[in-house]
Amino acid sequence: VSLVVPPYPPARYTADEPEVSAWLKRADAPPDYQSPAGVSYHYLANQQATDGDYGLYRVDIAPAGGGPGPHFHRAMSEAFFVLSGTMRLYDGTDWVDGHQGDFLYVPPGGVHGFRNEVEEPASILMLFAPGAPREAYFEGFGALADMTDDERREWFVRHDNYWV
């Protein structure tokens, strides 16, 4: 059996000496944003912190806290890793229960959704690659109620969110 190994990408750090540039975000840090619906967003590594490589977020969803229905993104992939609780995950065909340790990868254009339907909290890691300014998306939901239909459509397109 022969294993085909793709090449590594070109070097991005080319200095002769290493640098001290790592940073740590503690698990007990307060959320970066708490939505009125009871969703806590922890911005673990956003677009600015990763130079656009990816965005990684821990999302803690209240019991029966819902979530987005089927949608897709044109500019980025998205991945979900269930940390705790039960999340309903939509893979473009079926809604399935995702439990601790389950993983869903969605390439650009892939239909997906997620939600917490049970009476227990759930927590997931969400990864977007390349990174995008998702913080404005998460924090902007409160303004949707005051928008016209056209403004709402434009807002979702601006945030690379296309409903199915």
Give each language-model segment a name:
Residues 1-55, 144-164:
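A short, N-terminal "cap"/entry segment at the start of jelly-roll beta-barrel domains
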Residues 93-111:
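Short acidic-glycine-tyrosine-enriched beta hairpin
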Residues 66-67, 73, 87, 113, ...:
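Hydrophobic small-molecule pocket/channel-lining residues, especially in calycin-type beta-barrels
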Residues 75, 94, 110-111, 120, ...:
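A generic "binding-loop/recognition-motif" signal
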Residues 75-87, 92:
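Glycine- and acidic-residue-biased ligand/ion/polar-headgroup-sensing regions
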Residues 39-45, 57-73:
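Conserved short histidine dyad/triad with adjacent acidic residue
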Residues 117-164:
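Double-stranded beta-helix
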Residues 90, 115-117:
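A generic structural motif
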